[in-house]
């Protein structure tokens, strides 16, 4: 069964394809004016495609975090990198009782960390995506291309 992230990406990709169809139609209709006159469609398609990919990546990361928290019952079963990421976040907390809050509901804490980190993503650059997969799922850069 496809994930919600994939379904959303497919829907957005259909919109990109419609922009491409419009571009091709306008190019045929106004062939004398050249591609420069359709620059706005090219930019719109590219921006929409990039933002769709960013939303897809964010959704995949969040869905993966949710999947992990449904399957794992103890934080010690998380990948080492995820444990380090959580530990670093707890240490940086200004609230002195954060370790207790983490202990009470580590799954929610883990999901919130993922949520806040993906909201900071802003651009789907490879190194940023790889870092998120490494930090939360223990998947190294070599495993993602």
Show where each model-derived region lies.
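Charged alpha-helical initiation segments
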Residues: 1-47, 59, 71-81
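Helix-loop junctions and short alpha-helical segments
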Residues: 48-49, 60-145
């Amino acid at each position: 069964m496809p994930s919600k992230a994939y379904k959303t990406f497919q829907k957005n990709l259909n919109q990109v394809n419609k922009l491409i169809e419009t571009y091709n139609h306008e190019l045929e209709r106004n062939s004398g004016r050249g591609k420069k006159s359709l620059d706005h469609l090219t930019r719109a398609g590219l921006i929409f495609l990039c933002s769709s990919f960013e939303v897809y990546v964010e959704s995949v990361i969040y869905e993966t975090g949710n999947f992990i928290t449904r399957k794992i019952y103890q934080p010690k079963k998380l990948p080492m990198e995820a444990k380090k990421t959580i530990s670093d976040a707890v240490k940086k907390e200004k609230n002195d009782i954060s370790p207790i809050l983490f202990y009470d509901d580590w799954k929610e804490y883990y999901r919130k960390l993922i949520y806040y980190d993906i909201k900071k993503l802003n651009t789907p650059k490879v190194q940023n995506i790889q870092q998120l997969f490494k930090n939360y799922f223990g998947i190294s850069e070599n495993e993602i291309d």
